[in-house]
């Protein structure tokens, strides 16, 4: 190695030779990646400059000494001076582009390892680093002879709420470029694995063949004729400009495949690169991903959520490829959660933000869109508008219960105005009248409060019946009162995921066997969406209209009867609905009156307007304050505050299957990604009050820091899961 070579990365190969990547090579590599990524939204030169500047601090003597010592290249070398390298590029950016670049270049460069900072911290950070450098702005070794490239202004006009997404998107381009160029040098095998992937143009014929096969092998029954009509309308409407679209199809109308064919053809027509399907429940994700893999092959579908089992893919190379793809979403088809999608859009962490630039120029399907959090609805909808306007993203909202996301809703009491999307184009015209053609259920509503025993007696009159309630306690109480003739099942999140999945599969198998005459199930809301089951009769505890119609979607799903009934009931006063969202939703439904066509889209619109008028805010954590002033972007603070699922509980490992063996493996070998994934299948989430109660009972122990285990078999019931009688049971299950 020549003395003047400035090292960016180095490693020792199997033959003991040192392989070096110079800082010039790395900076050029990052610049080329970032230029390409930012070019997708017209900001290629911004990406290139970020790449060129981000590691200028590595030119200092102190950093060169540091990297040689830490790598073992010169283990005895003395390190003197400030080894922090990220801030140097930020100082140069300020010299070249002045204060106007504070939010769009300085922050990205100084934060490319640590995470984006709040605006008011940036100058303080740089000044602190200058002081560490003996009050010199830059180490004398750093070459600042860099051409000041004129950066073009964005071709799009930006409003106040757009700037934070623009800033974060530039950051995404830089950090993913940095990760990828480093990987190409340090781990060429992984980098090579990433490269083999198909385009949507390659995959579209596979979907078209699947649709032809389905049509050829299906009869001409009414339901199949309707599904074909929906698909043909989606194909017709796919030849449209990038924008906002909705697909409102009742249960049984073939929404999954129809939305997919629209998205694929729309993307190919508009030159969009990938399809991202965001879903609120992991149970729906698993089903949807399975359908997609059967069409496109498992090598073309990325399933990204916390419950994915990495070992479900047997091919080790494909397993590694999918794992790598979760890092930056460079894949043609992605199925993920709403939480993963939206919390990434508001994150400040490099490992999370690196995927954002791959949302650019894509089609996003938001499934069961009515489940979007009301508490964050305004910043979420504003982010959708920004991604459409700045980043060429088309959005498709799919559900049987379409919420109101367009227009302005104000004049409510309390005064909580909601500013929606200017225009959302519905794919299915009114004259299709799908809610009439696909009607297989009627609602019978009784608002008089019933006792547990009265509801149990009503359920016992039916041989096959599903009852959905709002709380874990209600599920437990009703289940324990039901007669145990035939098959009687309980479903709630007091069962660990492995137990829950096993019970749902047992239920599906039982329903397919006509010899199982009696099947009675009591469940919390977890079964309302994404669990493909069919009962002749459904009971649903009072709730919002969207939840009731979701429950009705489990009733006569296959149309085996002319018309079935979903009964809506209330429990007596001592079992009132939990205050908050559930009570608001039920109140909005009750305010519609009783003489309603409950399944009509107009009724759903009226319901959501009633519901919105009961909300004090659609921006619970005040994202507007943190993010809507371009001169003061609190990106770090906003990321901490934007939590769609507030993690107020404690996870405990319960005694089920081989969970205790996994705990022992962890204690002996320490934690690993694969082991923690396996162990997560045996965890139940409880709140702090009940966690403390279990501790006082002496049944929970901390086996390792942060790992709490209940290893008493008698504490975990094979039918209802973790046994505990406390206030946690009254908490509404949202997921």
Q: What are these model-predicted stretches?
A:
Residues 272-296, 305-308, 404:
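Conserved Walker A/P-loop ATP-binding site and its immediately adjacent core
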Residues 338-342, 352-390:
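SF2 helicase catalytic motif II
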Residues 241-263:
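Walker A/P-loop
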Residues 297-346:
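Inter-Walker segment of RecA-like/P-loop motor cores
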Residues 401-460:
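Interdomain hinge/linker at the junction between the two RecA-like core domains of SF2 helicases
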Residues 2-209:
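Accessory nucleic-acid engagement/destabilization modules that flank
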